């Protein structure tokens, strides 16, 4: 019987109701299960960070809306999102997986944290900073992402481009020398990143989990992530 890797999925919370409940789509779990993994929701308890890092094969860092540190943004800008206890837990988990060279897949906010932990910088308001850019914060809108040849993302999806959804206000706009952009929107905005020094640490800005029940080429990202976790 094929080993099904255990994937830690840090839960998101509804920051609009004072952080009193976890709140996220089931599609993250469906996507991991469909790709052959066993997803487990991880709550915000510091006592289980070490256990999660040691006992789970891969980390899925999901989307969400919460405040990042000011030094993660380009000069004189700061987060417009509410504070959340998710930040220190996710940061510790991700740092643990990075240190152990275990697979990480970041989606939306998860991609942004992966980038900023490696020295990248963001803007809290993409439309204000880049008025000529596409409307990236419009639900129901789709745009093309061009994929960098030879990247982990390109190998995963087997294509040079794909059509994705787009609903994010914040965006990674400055890369460090530790990170490469493996996907960009038609307007040049960074839509996917990778950490070359890590066996499998990639992030996508769009919400691939929204396609979990569809025949979408991007779902191969989950398959590649689960396979990397199986081999970790």
Segment roles from a protein language model:
Residues 108, 168, 207:
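Active-site glycine-centered loops adjacent to acidic/histidine catalytic or metal-binding residues
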Residues 111-113, 132, 171:
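Short, catalytically relevant binding-site loops at active-site mouths
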Residues 201-205:
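Active-site-proximal beta-strand elements of phosphoester/diester hydrolases
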Residues 106, 110, 115, 119:
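Gly/Ala-rich beta-loop-alpha elbow adjacent to hydrolase catalytic centers
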């Amino acid at each position: 019987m094929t080993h099904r890797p255990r994937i830690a999925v840090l839960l998101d919370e509804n920051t609009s109701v004072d952080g009193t409940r976890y709140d996220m789509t089931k599609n993250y779990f469906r996507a991991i299960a469909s790709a052959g993994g066993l997803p487990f929701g991880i709550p915000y308890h510091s006592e289980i960070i070490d256990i999660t890092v040691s006992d789970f094969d891969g980390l899925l860092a999901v989307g969400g809306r919460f405040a990042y540190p000011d030094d993660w943004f380009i000069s004189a800008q700061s987060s417009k999102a509410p504070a959340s206890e998710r930040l220190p837990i996710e940061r510790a988990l991700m740092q643990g997986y990075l240190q152990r060279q275990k697979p990480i897949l970041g989606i939306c906010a998860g991609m942004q944290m992966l980038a900023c932990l490696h020295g990248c910088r963001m803007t809290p308001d993409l439309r204000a900073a880049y008025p000529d850019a596409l409307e990236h914060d419009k639900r129901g809108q789709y745009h093309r992402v061009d994929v960098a040849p030879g990247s982990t993302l390109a190998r995963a999806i087997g294509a040079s481009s794909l059509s994705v959804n787009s609903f994010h206000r914040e965006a990674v706009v400055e890369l460090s020398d530790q990170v490469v952009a493996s996907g960009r929107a038609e307007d040049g905005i960074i839509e996917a990143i990778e950490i070359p020094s890590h066996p499998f640490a990639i992030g996508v800005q769009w919400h691939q989990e929204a396609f979990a029940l569809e025949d979408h080429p991007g779902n191969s990202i989950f398959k590649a992530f689960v396979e990397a976790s199986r081999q970790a």
